[in-house]
Amino acid sequence: MGKYFGTDGVRGVANRELTPELAFKIGRCGGYVLTKSAERPKVLIGRDTRISGHMLEGALVAGLLSIGAEVMRLGVISTPGVAYLTKALGAQAGIMISASHNPVQDNGIKFFGPDGFKLSDEQEQEIETLIDSPEDMLPRPIGSSLGQVNDYFEGGQKYLQYLKQTIDEDFSGMKIALDCAHGATSSLATYLFADLEADVITMGASPNGLNINEGVGSTHPEALAAFVKEKGADVGLAFDGDGDRLIAVDERGNIVDGDQIMYICAKYLKETGRLKQQTVVSTVMSNLGFYKALEAQGISSVQTAVGDRYVVEEMKKNGYNLGGEQSGHIIFLDYNTTGDGMLTALQLVNIMKIKGKPLSELAGEMKKYPQLLVNVRVTDKEKAMEHEQVKKVIAEVEAEMNGNGRVLVRPSGTEPLVRVMAEAPTEEACRTYVERIADVIRREMGVE
């Protein structure tokens, strides 16, 4: 990770850390790096529903126009929508303003290249070097060479029309509950599923600039679980603030996470001869039960570090077409270049419709090991990971597990947290292991 770019672009508290001044520089320097070979480069900008999105969009646009880029504002749209449209419209770059599942005071900026993929570490480093340069030596066009800005709010509909082409069925006869996290999918998802003839009921679809992710969405699926049971829905689909994740809820109100969704999709793709190399890419956070279920179906798995960018890198490198994270980032590389909540939702409901089976039955084939994750707020996450007492307690816990479970301790890519996760045969054992490690981290490096 660099000075500004974390695992998912630039993030920070809007107007404190991620200021309009910094956003202007990011637009100017990022736009230059991504468009320097084009004469009148085209750059798309989308945003989620945060109140700070307008401020950051204005600053980014100014930076881009100052190097001669033509800017197309997409308005409120999902992150995967920006990724798709960047490639589909032949733009040199796409930019999404969002902090995904983070609280409303945070915001972020992430770039996509002309192929719709996120930037490489080398490209991010080049942008950072220009931002920190003591003197701005970038071009300063004047007159007719300056960039112009136009709105392309119909981009969202173009993206939805593309998504509909990825499935075979309509959803008539199905009652589908949506939770849009008061975020980027609030109008898009409702339109999409209604257009596919589902009986759609929604919650978390009234954004006011301040309520994104607040007690709703994929990080709070218990709200949707209650809604599904109350309304008698066949399935619940929860997105996060920028629409790149999906967590589902079955007809009984049970939460179906990214591992289970990946398993269902992997099995179906294998059955229909479309799972490339009979392999799924996941991260080290995936449940042991996920790997056992895949193995039983004759499906191989590859693990990466946490972060959908690492999953995508592995998929591109070795020609796989399905991968994702337990948190609900699922990548169907045949259809899009990044995690896509609405695309994943379509594939999942399509499988339910084709098989004529409820989600509880499809997800029930994968037996999850009890898993517990605790976040510990720390003064310095890198130092915490290198602390001798922390290393010692992790080694002790791993020795006690003796192969019957696992522990994973890692720094958050976007927040000052250390995440402590354990899997074990019982919930009590998980809790014991996690708290033992978390207590040491709190004692040695915790925030008072």
Curated annotation (Swiss-Prot):
Please give the residue positions where the record annotates the modification Phosphoserine: 100
Q: Which GO terms describe its molecular function?
A: magnesium ion binding; phosphoglucosamine mutase activity; phosphomannomutase activity
Look up the record and name the cofactor or cofactors this protein needs. Answer: Mg(2+)
Highest taxon, organism lineage: Bacteria
Entry comment on modification after translation: Activated by phosphorylation.
Set out the biological process GO terms recorded for this chain's protein. Answer: carbohydrate metabolic process; peptidoglycan biosynthetic process; UDP-N-acetylglucosamine biosynthetic process
* EC main group: isomerase
The answer on whether this UniProt entry bears the keyword Metal-binding reads yes
Q: Which reaction does it catalyse?
A: alpha-D-glucosamine 1-phosphate = D-glucosamine 6-phosphate
- Cofactor binding comment, as recorded: Binds 1 Mg(2+) ion per subunit.
Fetch the SUPFAM superfamilies from UniProt. Answer: Phosphoglucomutase, C-terminal domain, Phosphoglucomutase, first 3 domains
Q: Which GO terms describe its cellular component?
A: cytosol
- EC numbers, comma separated: 5.4.2.10
UniProt entry tagged with the keyword Transmembrane: no
The family database entries (InterPro entries) matched by this protein are listed as: A-D-PHexomutase_a/b/a-I, A-D-PHexomutase_a/b/a-I/II/III, A-D-PHexomutase_a/b/a-II, A-D-PHexomutase_a/b/a-III, A-D-PHexomutase_C, A-D-PHexomutase_C_sf, A-D-PHexomutase_CS, Alpha-D-phosphohexomutase_SF
Q: Give any Pfam family that matches.
A: PGM_PMM_II
Mind listing the UniProt keywords for this protein, alphabetically? Isomerase, Magnesium, Metal-binding, Phosphoprotein
Give the residues the record marks as binding Mg(2+): 100, 240, 242, 244
Provide the active-site residues from the annotation.
Answer: 100 (phosphoserine intermediate)
Per the entry, what this protein does is: Catalyzes the conversion of glucosamine-6-phosphate to glucosamine-1-phosphate.
What does the similarity note say? Belongs to the phosphohexose mutase family.
What is the name attached to this protein's record?
Phosphoglucosamine mutase
**What is the native source organism of this protein?**
Geobacillus thermodenitrificans (strain NG80-2)
What is the gene name? glmM
